[in-house]
Amino acid sequence: MQVTSWGNTRRITIIINDMKKTKIVATISDKRCEVEFLEKLYRAGMNVVRLNTAHQDMEQALKVVENVRKVSDNIAILIDTKGPEVRTMLMDEPMHVDRGETIYLTGDPDLKMEGKLIHVSYPYFAEDIKVGDKVLVDDGDVELVVVEKKDHYLEMMVTNEAVIKNRKSVNVPGASLKLKSLSDKDRAFIDFAIDNNLDFIAHSFVRNKEDVMAIQAILDARGSKIKVIAKIENQEGVDNIDEILDYAYGVMVARGDLGIEIEAEKIPKIQRYIVKKCIESKKPVIIATQMLHTMIEHPRPTRAEISDIANAVYMGTDAIMLSGETAYGAYPEEAVTVMREVAEENEGTVPPDAGRSLVRINNEIT
């Protein structure tokens, strides 16, 4: 298949063997974004580059954008905002914790006390959390239980031996936190996306239509045609999927945080439910997280990972996403190739569906 850029500044033609309908989104880090590297992924079947702003500043993100556009204007660019999240902070060194140990969590950055104290980035943390609540740190690798509430901190019991590091995610399944949908950093990156004519903004932890409307208002005020993709990562987002689909261009089923906020065994059912809703609404849907996680360290995927990709294709998803596999994994080109081959092999069983193809600002993604 011959692919030619549509931009006015370059005429780059690359021959790639990409006959699939399902698009591949690859997360790219500024630490590995050389033109030669990106060209290999493009030849392997990458259609969209994802920038994760939780781990990049604007200078780093711009480096990726510039190199992507040196490869081909046919590669769409998606920027991923942090959204309303809580993270550990103010940790000079990692903290080792043992099972059954007592530690303390606070949202007060000025609080100091004896014992192992961890600060988090949400000032009302002690106020909003109840005794008995589970607190999951670092994508669920560390599990804590609230045993006592104080005015400015929580006493926690550690349920598994682990190491807690700075800037790691903090989740409280089922809790309703009074978090702003857009942080100052999110707003700055939305402006960055507009200034650099990016294609998609994927907003994290979308809970309702208001979260989508807040971004759309910024885009409309600046006359931008960037499309908003709502990342569904908690129960509130699942419950409000109908109103979210009324306002978002499309949806990403972000199974990482979703599997922390909701019991893991429910995720396949929720994935199928959201994909069905998107098909009914004629809105594109992306399936994300750990699709080829084994290939971060190993050259071959597991059979379960192959089945996961195939099942996403069977459901009728528009795009499938790689995260660590391409951002820092040892076998990024191989991961894209595997994803493309599995998609091509299994797309023939999916009935054609008009009107849901993932479309960027100017044209359909090729």
Pin down the residues of each PLM region.
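Non-catalytic helical/linker scaffolds that mediate oligomerization, partner binding
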Residues: 15-366
